Amino acid sequence: MMSSYVMSPVDETYTLFQILKGSALFLLVLWTIFANSLVFIVLYKNPRLQTVPNLLVGNLAFSDLALGLIVLPLSSVYAIAGEWVFPDALCEVFVSADILCSTASIWNLSIVGLDRYWAITSPVAYMSKRNKRTAGIMILSVWISSALISLAPLLGWKQTAQTPNLIYEKNNTVRQCTFLDLPSYTVYSATGSFFIPTLLMFFVYFKIYQAFAKHRARQIYRQKLAVSSHVIRKHIESTILHEISHVLPTSDEFAKEEEEEEDSESSGQVENGLGNGNDAIIEEDECEDEDSDEKRDDHTSMTTVTATVTGPTEAPYMKREAKISKSVPIEKESAIQKREAKPMRSVMAISYEKVKRHKNRKERIYRKSLQRKPKAISAAKERRGVKVLGIILGCFTVCWAPFFTMYVLVQFCKDCSPNAHIEMFITWLGYSNSAMNPIIYTVFNRDYQIALKRLFTSEKKPSSTSRV
């Protein structure tokens, strides 16, 4: 008679949880390996991308890839099984490799930020030294400092520890592979692996943000100066002929209608964001009578002025041309002219004041239209810069701060040990930073995006036969 085993609801829930946990860990490990390997492939196939900043990002990808290949597979099996199922000697190697790769990854983040900080704050002095040799020194310093922290227990520090890395629980039936239970080493490793590089990272990115903000402020100021002087002056000078044409109508009512029409056109142009810094183009044709001696009247002469005014617009199709052709009789010196000179000067003065007020209004509207676009571009760039810095620091802090807080707290508070599931979640939250780094440090790099697109979309070219 065969006995059948029926799973209880508790067993089914536990099995489902294990399956989901194993699937999530498997996908995380797979993505960490794939994404960081992709960074290497792109850098290898594109020599143009092998610059100092990209080499530092490549070293970051190498440390994350090493974590994904060596540490994460063992850690995932350990998390699913709930105990250390590998040989005892492998426990020390696992812990040392974990500290080495995690520390190198964190320090690489700081070095990438430090390189950007030097390039922005000391461009002349640093750019002369920013070469592959400098990048090699920085990369070597990262791995040396990480090795001094991770290999310290193997070099004799663990001899003073009360318990080794591998401990036995539940009547010596369950083995657990843990970090070295030694307060001095805990402080040493946490300080060197997290707190110092974190402070350095926040400092350099804060300075980068300050330098970025000052640069944008100076750029806006220079744009304002350009708008206030050269561009505005050229625009006003180029439209003098067009503005003077408003003096010619003798009817005040007609001049008022023309003025209101121009105001409405200028307002509509600014509201639609069409103002731009293009210079107005003036074409002036002064036409003289060919047969002046024959056609000139004894009492009057005719002078014709034709002006073509192209207003400053942002789109070609918005070019505004106005042909103004006025014939003004100029009386010769006579008694009638002398009597009418004073009223004419009065009319001209009134018309000139109207034109002057209208020109001042147009100048203010034009100035605002030119200033609006640089401010919008500056604000967009500043928001993007702040967004990138926020993502870098935010992801790093969210991923690693809980782990190192728990790491130090548990060492000095034995009763503060979290639940096994919470401890596993916090540990893997730190590991997940290695899966995010390839996205954060490459998605905002346009050159990398282009190279990555070419890597997946480029077709194989037919091989050309070489002549022997």
From Swiss-Prot:
Pfam families: 7tm_1. It is a multi-pass membrane protein. Residues 255-265, 281-292 have a biased composition (Acidic residues). It comes from the Eukaryota. Glycans are attached at N171. Residues 1-23, 78-91, 158-186, 411-424 are extracellular. Keywords: Cell membrane, Disulfide bond, G-protein coupled receptor, Glycoprotein, Membrane, Receptor, Transducer, Transmembrane, Transmembrane helix. The keyword Membrane applies. InterPro entries: GPCR_Rhodpsn (IPR000276), GPCR_Rhodpsn_7TM (IPR017452). One of its GO terms (molecular function) is G protein-coupled amine receptor activity. Disulfide bonds join C91-C177. Expressed in the pharyngeal neurons, MCL/R and NSML/R and the AS group of amphidial sensory neurons, ASEL/R, AGSL/R, ASHL/R and ASIL/R. Residues 44-54, 115-134, 210-387, 445-468 are cytoplasmic. It is found in: Cell membrane. Residues 252-306 are annotated as: Disordered. The chain crosses the membrane at residues 24-43, 55-77, 92-114, 135-157, 187-209, 388-410, 425-444. One of its GO terms (cellular component) is plasma membrane. G-protein coupled receptor for tyramine, a known neurotransmitter and neuromodulator and direct precursor of octopamine. Expression in amphidial sensory neurons suggests a role in chemosensation. PANTHER family: ADRENERGIC RECEPTOR-RELATED G-PROTEIN COUPLED RECEPTOR, TYRAMINE RECEPTOR TYRA-2. Belongs to the G-protein coupled receptor 1 family. This is Tyramine receptor tyra-2. It comes from Caenorhabditis elegans.
